[in-house]
Amino acid sequence: MSLDTVVEDIRDEARARADEIRSEGEERAEEIIDEAEREADDIVDEAEREAERKISQERDQKLSSAKLEAKQARLEARREVLEEVHDDVEAQIADIDGDEREALTRSLLDAAAEEFDGDSVRVHGHEDDADLLEGIVADYDGFEVGEPVDCLGGVVVESDASRVRVNNTFDSILEDVWEENLREISARLFEE
């Protein structure tokens, strides 16, 4: 075998090996490209899912916020209606006069008088009820009309001797009744 043949065989072998390496390299490059494309697709898919999740979350938050605002607006409107009704009731109570006012005032004083022994008891009421109170208090021993108080009517009865103070004003009765019946009032007004 000649040297040229050996060189040629080595070259052929080197070319074959180079072709094999090139082929393996191209195959590996294709695998890397395929893997990179799959990873890129996965990244895009994940980004799309994340974007959809964020959009859904924002939509839910905005919807929740809108519902809360609507609920607050309804509650505010209801509160305003309840205040108007309360104010109307107060006005109607303040307008009670004549025999009805006297009967109510006497009844409230009777209830309060049970708490006192009759020693220097002062009865306070609305300033416009001074004459009415003078007439009613005359029927009670040890009771006298005191200074007027800011109220719709009724009486505030107190005694220094017993340190007892009974608030039987129309206002206090209204507030008690209002608080006790607020659910029912609300249900009737708003058909709940």
Swiss-Prot record:
GO terms for molecular function: ATP binding; proton-transporting ATP synthase activity, rotational mechanism; proton-transporting ATPase activity, rotational mechanism. Component of the A-type ATP synthase that produces ATP from ADP in the presence of a proton gradient across the membrane. Has multiple subunits with at least A(3), B(3), C, D, E, F, H, I and proteolipid K(x). It is a peripheral membrane protein. GO terms for biological process: proton motive force-driven plasma membrane ATP synthesis. It is found in: Cell membrane. NCBIfam families: PRK02292.1. Keywords: ATP synthesis, Cell membrane, Hydrogen ion transport, Ion transport, Membrane, Transport. Residues 1-66 are annotated as: Disordered. SUPFAM superfamilies: V-type ATPase subunit E-like. It holds the Pfam family vATP-synt_E. Gene3D superfamilies: ATP synthase, E subunit, C-terminal (3.30.2320.30), F1F0 ATP synthase subunit B, membrane domain (1.20.5.620). The keyword Lipid metabolism does not apply. GO terms for cellular component: plasma membrane; proton-transporting two-sector ATPase complex, catalytic domain. Residues 27-49 have a biased composition (Acidic residues). Belongs to the V-ATPase E subunit family. Residues 8-26, 50-66 have a biased composition (Basic and acidic residues). The keyword Ion transport applies. This is A-type ATP synthase subunit E. The gene is atpE. InterPro entries: ATPase_E_C, ATPase_V1_Esu.
